[in-house]
C-alpha cells in the first residue's frame, strides 16, 4: 500500500487549464447622440416631429417623422386635422408652405396653411 501511495504522489500534476487574461474594464458607452439633423432651417420643433429634410420622405405623418418636403424642407404642424375637406391638397393643411430660404419652423399654435412657420 505504501508503494501505491508513493506512486500517486510522484505522478505529475494534471495540466491546468490556461487562465484567461484579466478582462479589461469595458469603457463606458458615450451618451446616445440624437440623429444628425439637417440645418436648422429645415428642422421642426420637437413637438412636431423633430427634423425635416429631403431624407425624411415626402409625406406628413408619424411614419416620416412628422415632416413633409413641400417648400424645401417644410415641417408639419404638431396637431393633425382629422377632417380632410381639401381633397385636392391633402398635405398642405398640415405643412408649412414657406420657401426653403426661410427658417421653415412650425409652431403648434396656428392652424393656417403657412401660419405655423417662423
From Swiss-Prot:
One of its GO terms (biological process) is keratinization. Induction: By UVB. Residues 1-10, 92-103 have a biased composition (Low complexity). InterPro entries: LCE. Keywords: Keratinization. It comes from the Eukaryota. Interacts with CYSRT1. Precursors of the cornified envelope of the stratum corneum. This is Late cornified envelope protein 1E.
Amino acid at each position: 500500500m505504501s508503494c501505491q501511495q508513493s506512486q500517486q504522489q510522484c505522478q505529475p500534476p494534471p495540466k491546468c487549464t490556461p487562465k484567461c487574461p484579466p478582462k479589461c474594464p469595458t469603457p463606458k458607452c458615450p451618451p446616445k447622440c440624437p440623429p444628425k439633423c439637417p440645418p436648422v432651417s429645415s428642422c421642426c420643433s420637437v413637438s412636431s416631429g423633430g427634423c425635416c429634410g429631403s431624407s425624411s420622405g415626402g409625406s406628413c405623418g408619424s411614419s416620416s417623422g412628422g415632416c413633409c418636403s413641400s417648400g424645401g424642407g417644410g415641417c408639419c404642424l404638431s396637431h393633425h386635422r382629422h377632417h380632410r375637406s381639401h381633397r385636392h391638397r391633402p398635405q398642405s393643411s398640415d405643412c408649412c408652405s414657406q420657401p426653403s430660404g426661410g427658417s421653415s419652423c412650425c409652431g403648434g399654435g396656428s392652424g393656417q396653411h403657412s401660419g405655423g412657420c417662423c
